[in-house]
Amino acid sequence: MEDINALSFGTFLLLSFFGAWWHWNKMRREGRVAGTFKDYLLADHPANSMATGAMLLAATWAAATSGTADLVNPQLIVTMLMAGKLHVASFNAIGSAFIIGYGFDSIINKGGNQ
């Protein structure tokens, strides 16, 4: 089995959950859901939220084992920024993590109770 960097895994997963949060925030602004993000995840439709979480974990695992998650490692990002550069691959990985979270939440978690 390939070694997985826990910091890279956690950062990619956090960025994915940020995408899911962004989707909830968009639905809240449109009036499609009410309440907090916690209510949206746990109270309204917990089975959908569990499915979304499972998909985010699976996508993060795939990103970590393929090496994509290593591109969002905060230590790497800080080192590159201190050198005055940031690789396009890191931008792509950050965007991918965000889109994975937003997309899976959009597909699976259709909305909460109003």
Stretches with model-predicted labels:
Residues 1-114:
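Cationic, hydrophobic amphipathic alpha-helical membrane-interacting segments
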